[in-house]
């Protein structure tokens, strides 16, 4: 399954297949839960009144802060990229319960909230691309487009979207209980990073639907996120 849903890379210009302007849109498709490793979880958690689980983790983002400043790149963009990269290596991120069905995707997107020209906020889905330069180009183009048009950019019909919210001006540890009964997507939230003498840390909360993944998968993702931050390079 992991091979069939892995993000494919374009052979030209080192761009990801799904980021290439001439790539074919791949939509989500329904799959039989009984034919997946999530069969038991689907049966146990789909009708649960509160199927969401929240984990907290304190990340060392010292390298990310330095990388951002040295290369003139936005910290939030780099966080979104590392989140997408870590998630793309875990097959459970290509599944999502939607309504009463289990859907499978071939790509991942990372959502970010954008302050728009009307003084409100809009939602912007960013297609994950392994190429950091391409992801940055998409980030700058799409967030600017959304900010000016005040129109959400939605990829939920073609990609499994990881929601994020960065409250970078505020000192918070995370959030729990964000379940509307409509959206089951995994969601991350963080506030201001904290500086000390030796490192800079950022506490994040990660909420996920128990049908989609178990605690071990979520923990592996968060550990993977730290590794992606530590190994980030152009």
Residue ranges and their predicted role:
Residues 31, 46-78, 94-110, 162-164, ...:
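Gly/Ser/Thr-rich phosphate-binding loops and adjoining beta-strand/alpha-helix segments
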Residues 25-48, 109-115:
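Short amphipathic alpha-helices and their capping loops
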Residues 52-57, 64-70, 121-133, 213:
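Acyl-group handling in specialized metabolite and lipid biosynthesis
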Residues 64-89, 202-221:
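Acyl activation and transfer enzymes in specialized metabolism, enriched
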Residues 11, 17-18, 24:
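Short, positively charged and aromatic/hydrophobic N-terminal segments
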Residues 116-172:
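Helical lid/core segments from catalytic subdomains that handle acyl or acyl-like groups
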Residues 157-171, 186-223:
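Histidine-centered acyl-transfer/condensation active-site motif
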